[in-house]
UniProtKB/Swiss-Prot annotation:
Fe cation binds at C110, H153, H157. Binds 1 Fe(2+) ion. Keywords: Hydrolase, Iron, Metal-binding, Protein biosynthesis. Its cofactor is Fe(2+). It is an enzyme of class 3 (hydrolase). GO terms for molecular function: metal ion binding; peptide deformylase activity. It catalyses: N-terminal N-formyl-L-methionyl-[peptide] + H2O = N-terminal L-methionyl-[peptide] + formate. The keyword Protein biosynthesis applies. Its EC number is 3.5.1.88. Belongs to the polypeptide deformylase family. The lineage of its organism: Bacteria, Bacillati, Bacillota, Bacilli, Bacillales. This is Peptide deformylase. The active site is at E154.
Amino acid sequence: MLTMDDIVREGHPALREVATEVTFPLSDEEKKLGRDMLEFLINSQDEDLAEKYGLRGGVGIAAPQLAVTKRFLAIHVHDEKDRLYSYVLYNPKIRSHSVQQACLSGGEGCLSVDREVPGYVVRSERVTIDAFDENGTPLKLRFKGYPAIVIQHEIDHLNGIMFYDHINKENPSYLPPDVDVFG
């Protein structure tokens, strides 16, 4: 079982590397790590397990956060209508994104960042993702709102980008007009 001790923190070089694509068939280790990542997210959202194991609540995690610079991630997040998006995605790519932008009212956080970083992180409000499941089956997935923000945050990790790289340095509280605000 993964715990917070397995997650690397900001400053670790894996968080700034561009991760390499996985090849199929996946190794048993890659499959297990993907499943363990999803299990971590599920456990972190369970109040009792989170307290017992000292887990910070998370809705997404990427392999580089575990010092594995390969292109896969897990998300376990509900949208505004309580629909669950629970996936382990290998080699995810953003196929298309909306012009409409969105952000979280309280900014973003990250399991690899142990401090609060104030500021808006403006992202696309909708994205379409091409990816593969652990068996190499191609997937085309659409996300909007909060789940779209989460998936973009995790894909950024695969490209060596941290959420705070998107914050306006001169004015972190600047919010461009017509941005949808969630949360």
